Amino acid sequence: MVHVWMVKTDRVLSEEEAAALTACLPPERRVRLAGQLPRQQAEVLWAYGLLLALLRERCGWREIPSMDRTDSGKPFFPGHPQVHFSISHTEGAAAAAVADAPVGVDIQRIQTPPRHLARLTGLEEPEPFFESWVRWEARAKRTGTGILYMVRHRPPLAPGEVCTAIAAFPGYAAAAAGAETVLPEQVRRLTGADLLGCLDIWA
């Protein structure tokens, strides 16, 4: 079963909160985080905080385990191959998905699409562009296929593959790809305060 959580990052992380969330990351992810810009760091921390909360509820884990990447760049838990996950972050929001089969999730703020991508997709209006883009991105994340391959070739759904549009926050588009349809009761939407409140990591 696929479970998707989304958070509206409607507040700025304090230094204490950012440090506590950083401490929850696997060591290899902390190294990558250090090389990113502050705004990108905040988006990543919200996304991984969301993943941690979801893993705690669905798997009973207290921390995010060590991660690795496939040759195509898809992240996975080498010590827990039965648990599949995906995260996504954009300006003002993040999403995480956990499932018992390969899964991909994407969330995007709806805005004017980049010109080169609008030309590539043939979609110039913001809503149609991003409603399509999150589907392509979710499918690419599920398989580890590059997003440009997905956009250029737009392959049909593979046998057993399902891609579901998810009602996100106003001004955002989201989708999840997996082995089954994501039902409304499998989706949870949180505020930043909600998420931080369910993570007891401030000791």
Where does each model-flagged region fall?
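Core catalytic alpha/beta fold that binds nucleotide/phospho-ligands
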Residues: 1-203
